[in-house]
Structure formats: C-alpha cells, structure tokens
C-alpha cells in the first residue's frame, strides 16, 4: 500500500491518499507527506475490469482530487479489502505432514479520501471505452458472498487547484468515440465473446463440429484489425535510463518491449 501512496504523491501536493479501517472501526489515513509534485500537467489513468486493489486506490485518489481523468471500463474490479496470509505450518508444532497450506484472512477495508469504499463498486471511469471484458462478469460483485459496500467520513483533503473542465472533456471524448470505427468493432467483439461463453452447444457429429469451428474462425478474422490499430502513442525512457542502455542491452530490450505493449493501450 505504501508504494501506491508514494505513486499518488508524484501527482498531488501533500495530503491523504487512502483511508484504512480495521476491526472496532479504527480508522487510519495514509498520507503523502512530501510537499511538491513531480508532474503537474494533464493526466489520464487507464483502467479495465481487472484493475484491482492498489490500482483502484490510485485511480480513486486522483479522481477524488480532480487530478486525473479515468478512462476505460465502466467500473474497475471492486476489491476494497486487505488480507493477511498465515502459513499453517508455522502454527502447528512437530508437523510431519508437510506443507499444510495457509489461511488468508481479511483484516482491513480501505476507502477513498471522499469516504466511499471501492469494495464492489470499484472506480467508475469518467470516459467509458469498451473492451473484451465489457460483457463478462469478472468483478468482486460477481463473486460468491462478497463483503458489502459502505462509506466512512471523508478525509481532510484539498482538491487539485487546476480543475479539469470535465464537461468539455467528456463531450469531445464522447463525440470521438461515437465516430471511431475501431471502438464500435471492439464493442462488437466484446458482445461476441460474451455470447460464446454462454453458448454450451456440443456438436455430436463431425460435420457440424467442423462447420462451427470454421464459422468461429471466420468470425474472429473480422476482429483482426483491432490488433493492428495504431494508437500513435510514443514512449521514451527517462534520460538516466537511456544513459544505461549502452552498458545494459537487456534493460534496453525490456524497455522496448514495454513501450511496444504500452502503445497497444
């Protein structure tokens, strides 16, 4: 959790990042103690349905401060709890049975600085873009017996002084999304994936099986353009890393591969 608090501190000027509640309603506020920020320009946080836990803490904090625009799935995963892992082998003395596994015990729940939990609800994106998980139940809310959503008192924080013109940003973004054929194709693919997951048809004759397999292959080809989409995003390593590339070819290869993956976002 400390890592995500430090990360948020790069973009906000001192203040609470997340609240943690334990048994007995004890509340602890995790704060960025450092004055000043490393970057004060426009900021976007990309999320999807699998963004969970620490990534939700970061997205929620920057959203509450009005510091960033959250873009991605309708909501993130919705994991707002903290677990401790207790190895059973450390508890039972003279154990001759080998590894006994471990217990994972939920001990805490974390909350946004505005007071609401990310449990179940996750973080709602400001700008929603479909992806392959859009019509698949993958969140905490879709699990058996999840802890409920609740809220506590808001922490004392000061919103970002350079407030974003959300109305203008959302309007222009929506217009671009509606005109983007790739977004429409992505939504179509997401619906198709969901339909295939729900289809439990079992073909008992070889001819029907082969025909269905060929149909699926042809249908999937219609979405190949998505893998070739050029985001036109450019990435470069920080100067101190670039100076290391001449001596560390492995580091350079890792960064090149990472930048290539980032460009697909």
Residue spans for each PLM region:
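Conserved acidic, small-residue-rich alpha-beta core segments centered on
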Residues: 1-152
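Conserved functional hotspot residues or short segments at active or partner-binding sites
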Residues: 112-265
């Amino acid at each position: 959790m400390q890592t995500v608090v430090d990360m948020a501190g790069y973009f906000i000027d001192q203040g609470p990042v997340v609240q943690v509640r334990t048994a007995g309603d004890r509340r602890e506020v995790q704060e960025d103690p450092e004055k000043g920020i490393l970057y004060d320009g426009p900021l976007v946080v990309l999320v999807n349905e699998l963004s969970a836990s620490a990534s939700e803490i970061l997205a929620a904090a920057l959203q509450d401060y009005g510091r960033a625009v959250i873009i991605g799935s309708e909501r993130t995963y919705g994991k707002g709890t903290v677990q401790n892992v207790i190895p059973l082998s450390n508890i039972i003395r003279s154990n001759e049975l080998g590894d006994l596994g471990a217990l994972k015990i939920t001990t805490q729940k974390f909350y946004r600085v505005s007071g609401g939990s990310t449990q179940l609800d996750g973080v709602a994106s400001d700008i929603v873009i479909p992806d392959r998980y859009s019509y698949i139940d993958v969140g905490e809310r879709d699990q058996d017996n999840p802890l409920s959503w609740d809220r506590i008192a808001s922490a004392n924080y000061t919103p970002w002084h350079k407030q974003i013109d959300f109305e203008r940003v959302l309007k222009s973004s929506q217009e671009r999304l509606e005109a983007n054929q790739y977004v429409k194709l992505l939504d179509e693919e997401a619906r198709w994936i969901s339909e295939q997951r729900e289809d439990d048809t079992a073909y008992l004759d070889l001819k029907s099986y082969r025909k269905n397999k060929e149909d699926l292959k042809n249908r999937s080809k219609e979405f190949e353009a998505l893998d070739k989409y050029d985001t036109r995003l450019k990435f470069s390593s920080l100067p101190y890393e670039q100076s290391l590339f001449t001596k560390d070819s492995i580091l350079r290869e890792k960064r090149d591969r990472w930048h290539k993956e980032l460009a697909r976002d």
